[in-house]
């Protein structure tokens, strides 16, 4: 890559005609999934609504990491597919999907395969011709973290839903010819505002929130996965319909308080005024009591369907 005049910073260059493979990365993360009722009761901040998630066999190919079209199965049945019906239940149609957070490994095999997959999927779902679909190539920044890759993408996609801004692929010089011919795609080199505030007047005319985006992970082990994440406004609308505006207001107040507390704690940790990590103290298995072996309590709790957390703060089984 250096011999081609490409700087190290731009080695990962998804969809570019001079791409030459992924940049290795390491990392992981945690995504908290919750039922809507639990989120409302606990006042949990909602970053997005999981509209659809599924994994697929990706076919037998020439090598273990080679990608295929298996995730196209999400669109089996077209407008009557499980994906289309799941999104419709949240008020989302094919034309409302604004972007795809692509696996985009910057390899010769993956990038065109994935673009073809989403082009075919968009047509199967009934997306209108000319309705642009923004490609987000997050690995050009993070590298390829293998097991943590999709977690990174979930974080990035929810940030786009919150901000209305899609990141650009700064490493992209010229879109490879096989990809450039695919319909729908927009390949931004710089961040672009899809919704919300922007422009001289402070607002994109007629633009509402980014309603939904797709995320795909392809390849290794001949397995692929697809996730559809819908704007958190879908949760708010469902809560309003089920419990009224007062419930929405109560949830918002609690969620905003949690977000503020989290921000304060993170910033305090960054300047050394609070620990960023604290080990777990007490697993509620009776560690403090010499009469109970925590290891045995844990094993019994996992096997006993009647095990419950007692008023003393310790798990008890039917022993």
Regions found by a protein language model. Name each.
Residues 41-47, 91-96, 126-133, 205-209:
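Short helix-terminating capping/connector loops at secondary-structure junctions
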Residues 20-23, 216-220:
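Short Gly/Pro-enriched turn/cap motifs at secondary-structure boundaries
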Residues 37-39, 55, 105-107, 140-142, ...:
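Short, glycine-/Ser/Thr-/acidic-enriched flexible segments
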Residues 130-137, 193-212:
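Short, hydrophobic/aliphatic alpha-helical segments
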Residues 85, 303-319:
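Extended non-globular C-terminal regions
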Residues 23-44, 144-169, 180-202, 224-233:
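Active-site-proximal alpha-helical scaffold in enzymes
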Residues 1-23, 53-74, 102-112, 129-186:
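Acyl-CoA/ACP chain-elongation machinery
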